[in-house]
Amino acid sequence: MLTDQSKRDALLNTHIHPTAVIHPKAELHPTVTVGPYAVIGENVKIGAQTTIGAHAVIEGPIEIGIGNRIFPSAVIGLEPQDLKYKGAASWVKIGDYNTIREFVTINRATHADEVTEIGSHNLLMAYVHVAHNCVIEDHVIIANAVALAGHVHIESRAVIGGALGVHQFVRIGRNAMLGGMSRIDRDAPPYMAVEGNPSRVRALNLIGLKRAGLTAEDLSSLKKAFRLLYRSQLTFKEALEELQALSNNQYVEYLYQFLQASTTGEKRRGPIPGKN
């Protein structure tokens, strides 16, 4: 545990602009850089090699890992925009090597000991809003002006196009690709390309899957699953039952588990349908 004097000494050794306002109880690694007029509050912990841009605001409780780049005027860790919030000591937790661009807002969770969580190696472009209790896993790209409502969960390596909105409690599957300006009001299945208002599953996200290193055999299995779910004459329930028989492939198995949970899980909104 750092003493107050050691914290003050550490602050003197960091690269902090003289106009920045740092709470004396904030914990900044000596290699942290803080730009002009940034404000860092109490109960903030920031890891090594992280940079905080000019006019950024970071309030706690929050933990930020190593190597993050937080650009000017980002606002992170303020209380949620949720009428149920009653002043609880909720959290934001951010992993390592994220890029958080200008005017991004990331709100704390609503209830005590709950967390809004950002993983590692993510890119949040300018004006992205991450509401209370959201979870963003790893290697996610979110383009400009995307708004995530509360409790949205984005799995690893999803790509979210610009200027779209995501309804509360929606889950976006791994390696999914969401087209810009779409309305995402149901769960977006993993590995799929989704677009439109209302949004529909259009195709497999083949480019993203190839970049992720899936084999030709994996892609063939997912193509069969896609045709079964979105191009057959079966009802969705019937197609899901047939899909279970194909789930000897790990990616098809995950797709099946995701869709099953989407239709039966608590507070689930169901999966986005196909274009037909």
Swiss-Prot record:
Its annotated compartments are: Cytoplasm
User: Is Kinase tagged as a keyword?
Assistant: no
Quote the cellular component terms of the Gene Ontology held in the record. Answer: carboxysome; cytoplasm; membrane
Molecular-function GO term, any one? structural constituent of carboxysome shell
Q: Which GO terms describe its biological process?
A: lipid A biosynthetic process
Q: What does this protein do?
A: Involved in the biosynthesis of lipid A, a phosphorylated glycolipid that anchors the lipopolysaccharide to the outer membrane of the cell.
Q: Which Pfam families match?
A: Acetyltransf_11 (PF13720), Hexapep (PF00132)
Family statement drawn from the similarity comment of this UniProt entry = Belongs to the transferase hexapeptide repeat family. LpxA subfamily.
Functional pathway: Glycolipid biosynthesis; lipid IV(A) biosynthesis; lipid IV(A) from (3R)-3-hydroxytetradecanoyl-[acyl-carrier-protein] and UDP-N-acetyl-alpha-D-glucosamine: step 1/6
Q: What is this protein called?
A: Acyl-[acyl-carrier-protein]--UDP-N-acetylglucosamine O-acyltransferase
Q: Does the keyword Lipid biosynthesis apply?
A: yes
Q: Point out the gene that encodes the protein.
A: lpxA
